[in-house]
Amino acid sequence: EMPDPQPQAAPSASEEEPPAQDAAQEAQEEAPSSTGDPKIDALIQEKDRALQEMRRLNDAIEDEIISRRIDQLEDTTGKIIDQVVAHPEKLSQIRTFMNYYLPTTLKILNAYDRMGAAGVEGANIDGTMGRIDAMMDKVVEAFDKQLDALFADEALDISTDITVLEQMLAQEGLGGMQMGQS
C-alpha cells in the first residue's frame, strides 16, 4: 500500500505544467520587445491586446452584421499597426487612432456585448444597440481611412516617379503612341 502515494505525486507534477505553459507564453509575449524601440514595443503589445479583445467580442456577439464589422476592424487595425511597426516614423500619425478611436470602439462594442448578453428588451437598450449598429459602418470607414492615410506619402512618391518616368519616355521618343509608329 506504500506505492499508492507515489503515483499521486505524478498528478502534482501535471499540476505544475500550466505554470510552465504560462512561462512559455510570457516568453512569447516578451519576444516582440526585441525591436529596441520602447514605443514600438508598446504598440505591438497594444495591437495584441486589442486584437485579442476584438476576437473575444466577435465570439460573444451573435449579430452577424456586427460580427462582420468586427472582422473588418480586426483586419484593418492589424494592418495599421503593422505598417507603423515597419515604419516607426509614422507613429505620430496614429496617435489619435490609438488613444481615442480604438479604445472607444472597443468600449462601445463591450457595451453592445453586455446589452445583448443581458437578454433584456427595452427602449434604452434597443435604442443604444441600434445606434451602435448604425455607427459601425462609419467606424469601419474611419479605420480604413486611417490605414489609407499611412500610405499617402508612398502614393505621392510613386505618383511623382510615374510622372518623371512618363516624361523621360516621352523625351526619348519611347512613350505613348510613338512606340507603335516606329
Predicted features along the sequence, with ranges:
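Soluble C-terminal extramembrane regulatory/interaction domains of multi-pass membrane proteins
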Residues: 65-182
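Membrane-proximal, non-transmembrane interface segments of integral membrane proteins
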Residues: 1-83
